[in-house]
């Protein structure tokens, strides 16, 4: 595969976007070792623009390096490359993390146009969502709603509903629904985000932290402190691996301070299920025993048993079958 670094880059990107960090790192290593001066499939003179874009996507060294990598990718890849829109999205996210909100917003706007032109619908959906979050930050709720309507339309058109990064769209939509007083829609958006959250990992760390920050904001507004605390713990775990994420680090700290001011009266429920527990939940509906599930997930029997009992407790049930039934009723599992 080192003889085909472009294929390795694509494999690394797919692994990252679907929440598989170890696989993404493995393919990235193969791509880097196989880097050649031969042209890339999009007509770029070498594979370096693709590698630069991959490094930007993974953001292993913070927003400054991400910005440099994204600029290199955008500057050196072939004109009209189908990856130009992806490079613009990475540029926008790097500027956002650096606190350059206005610049980021303009780049997100450019990305939507580029993404639609080349069929990069996931990028367009994410860019529209980021514009919605920036609008929320300005208090422009109606504008945020319009951006989210467009993002949802793109997601539905391209069948992206089950794609992990779309979790951030649901987190933003939950906030808009909460502002509008639509409790049923709030619950629906939070449930969708919860189903996708386990697969939004440190493979793409800025999205992983952002999803948890935006969900924590919503749960905190609902006074569900147990859920907010769970999300901030997960954000901390990601930041231990990728500590340099600009404004997202500050947002986690601000939310933690806000959470400390709230009297903790909420009892951990389904909303407080951890990402690990949400990953286990679908396997509880299979014929596999807990030890067999442990083998499937490369976890010890004790770890799986502990996670399963934690799920039962948070769902308020006493058995595996009851947990599966109740999770399906909540929308966390397919019926």
Predicted regions and their residues:
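Amphipathic alpha-helical segments of tetratricopeptide repeats
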Residues: 29-40, 70-79, 109-120, 149-159, ...
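Helix-turn-helix DNA-binding segment
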Residues: 264-309, 313-318, 322-335
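Tandem amphipathic alpha-helical repeat scaffolds
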Residues: 5-21, 46-63, 82-100, 123-139, ...
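Helix-turn-helix repeat elements of alpha-solenoid scaffolds
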Residues: 19-34, 59-72, 99-110, 141-150, ...
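Conserved positions within tetratricopeptide repeat
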Residues: 5, 25, 67-68, 105, ...
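Linker/hinge segments immediately adjacent to helix-turn-helix/homeobox DNA-binding domains
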Residues: 188-192, 205, 212-276, 282, ...
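Inter-repeat boundary and helix-capping residues of tandem alpha-helical solenoids
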Residues: 1, 41, 45, 81-83, ...
């Amino acid at each position: 595969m080192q003889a085909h670094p472009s294929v390795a880059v694509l494999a690394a990107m797919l692994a990252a976007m679907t929440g598989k960090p170890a696989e993404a790192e493995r393919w990235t290593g193969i791509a880097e070792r196989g880097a050649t001066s031969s042209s890339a499939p999009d007509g770029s003179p070498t594979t370096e623009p693709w590698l630069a874009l991959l490094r930007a996507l993974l953001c292993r060294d913070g927003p400054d390096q991400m910005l440099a990598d994204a600029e290199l990718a955008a500057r050196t890849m072939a004109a009209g490359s189908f990856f130009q829109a992806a490079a613009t999205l990475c540029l926008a996210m790097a500027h956002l993390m650096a606190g350059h909100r206005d610049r980021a917003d303009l780049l997100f706007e450019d990305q939507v146009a580029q993404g639609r032109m080349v069929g990069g619908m996931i990028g367009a959906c994410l860019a529209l969502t980021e514009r919605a979050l920036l609008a929320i930050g300005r208090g422009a709720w109606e504008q945020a709603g319009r951006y989210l309507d467009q993002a949802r339309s793109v997601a539905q058109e391209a069948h992206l509903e089950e794609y992990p990064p779309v979790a951030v769209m649901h987190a933003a939509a939950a906030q808009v629904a909460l502002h509008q007083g639509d409790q049923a829609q709030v619950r629906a958006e939070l449930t969708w985000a919860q189903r996708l959250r386990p697969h939004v990992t440190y493979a793409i760390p800025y999205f992983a932290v952002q999803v948890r920050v935006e969900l924590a904001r919503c749960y905190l507004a609902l006074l569900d402190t147990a859920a907010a605390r769970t999300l901030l713990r997960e954000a901390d775990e990601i930041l231990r691996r990728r500590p340099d994420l600009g404004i997202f680090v500050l947002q986690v700290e601000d939310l933690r301070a806000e959470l400390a001011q709230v009297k903790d009266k909420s009892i951990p429920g389904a909303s407080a299920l951890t990402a690990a527990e949400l990953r286990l939940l679908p396997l509880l509906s299979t014929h596999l025993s807990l030890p067999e599930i442990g083998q499937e997930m490369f976890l010890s029997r004790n770890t799986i048993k502990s996670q399963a009992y934690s799920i039962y407790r948070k769902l308020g049930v006493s058995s595996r079958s009851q947990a599966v039934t109740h999770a399906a009723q909540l929308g966390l599992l397919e019926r």
